[in-house]
Amino acid sequence: MTSIQKFASPVLSRCVVALALALPMVAQAQTQTPVPTESGQVVGAQTPALPGDLSVVPAPGLTARAWLSMDVNSGQIIAAEGLNERVEPASLTKLMTAYLVFDALEAGRLKLDQTVVISDKAWRTEGSRMFVKVNSQVSVNDLLQGVIVQSGNDASVALAEAVAGSEGAFAALMNEEATKLGLTATHFVNSTGLPDPEHLTSVRDLGVLSAALVARFPQYLHYYSQKEYTYNNIKQPNRNRLLWLDNTVDGLKTGHTQSAGYCLVSTALRDGRRVVSVVVGTANDAARTENSLKLLNWSFQNFETVKLYDASNPAVTARVWEGELENVGLGTEGALWLTVPRGKSAEIKPVANYTQPLLAPLSKGDKVGTLTLSLDGKVLAEQPLLVLEDVPEAGFFGRMADKVRLMFE
C-alpha cells in the first residue's frame, strides 16, 4: 500500500488515506456464504440497498414487470428494473413463511419430527394445496415439503399456526422480521400469498429476504432443490422448472396469481459464487423460467465477485498514539466482497477516511471512519472502518512521549 498522506495537526482532524491504486488480483470468490450472527445479521455481505453503478455492462432484455439480480457474497444488487415498485408476491410470500419456521427450528421452538394437528382453517384454505386432512397430524418436515416443493397453502397455514398460534399472529411476526431485515416496501397479511390489497413487497425486498434465507439457513436449502414430493398418495412436482434445466440452480420459489402474474425467485451456485434472481409479473410459466435463466447467466458471465479484506488482511494500517501498540489494522466486520464487471477487479479504488490522530485506548470493533470502494469514478460500496484489535493505553511515560511527538507532527 502507498504511504499514508497525513493532514493531521495536534488537534483532532480528518484524514483521507488513499490506499493502493490497484489492488492485487484476487481470486474469484471461494465457497464462503456470509454467516449470520446470533442477531441474524449477515456478516460478510453489505446490506443491499441500491445497486452500485455497473452500467458499463448493458442489462439483459427481459419481459418481467420488475426484476433483480443480486450477488449473495457481496450483497450487491447487480442490476434491477422496478427495484422498489410495490408488487404482489403471490406464493413468493412462502419464503418468509419458511424463514420463520427455520428460525423456530434453530431456536428449538419447533422440531422437524414434531407433529402438527391440521385445523379446519388450514384444511379449508383455497389455492394450491398439499392435500392434508383436517384433524390429521402431520410432521413439520412433511409440512415444509408441502410449503416449499408443492407450494401448499394448507401447509403454510398449518405451520403458521404451529409457530404463532394463529395465522394473524404469524403475519405480525412476518412483518416484524421484515422490519429487522430492512424490507422497506413489504407488508404481509397472510402466510400464503393469497391476494390482498395490503399484501405487497418489492423485488429489492424479495432479493434481500432470499439472500438472508440462503446465508442464515444453509442446512435447509435442500428443500428448495427437491424436484417432487408425494403426500397422501398425491405426487406433485416442484414448479421451479430451472431445477431440470440447470444443475447449478438449487432454489428457490415460484409464485402465481392472476393479478401478480408468474413470478420466480431463483438462485444458483457456480464456482463458489451465489447469485439470486427475482422476476415478477411475467406472462406465463415459460416466460418466468426463460427470464430467470437469462438473468442468472448474464450475471455470472459478465460479473465477478472478489474478496478484498478480512480480519487477517486489513484495509489500512494506522498509527496509534499513546497506546501499547504503535500501529493497528483498520478494516471491516467480516470479509468484504465486491462485485464488479469481469476483468475490472484490479481497477477498484479503495479510500479510507478516518479520524487522526488515533488515540488509545481503542477497542476491537470501534468505528473510526469509512472505507469507500469505487470503480471508474463511481462509488460501489461504503463500509464502516473498524479497529481490528484492542489497543490498551500506554503507561504514563509512554503517553507523555507521544504527546510531545504529536506537537511536532
PLM regions and their residue ranges:
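Bacterial N-terminal signal peptides
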Residues: 14-24
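Ubiquitous "structural anchor" signal
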Residues: 21, 105-106, 116, 263, ...
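Sec/Tat signal peptide C-region and signal peptidase I cleavage site
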Residues: 25-29
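Domain-terminus/edge residues, biased toward the C-terminal soluble/receptor-binding domains
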Residues: 183-187, 195-200, 204-409
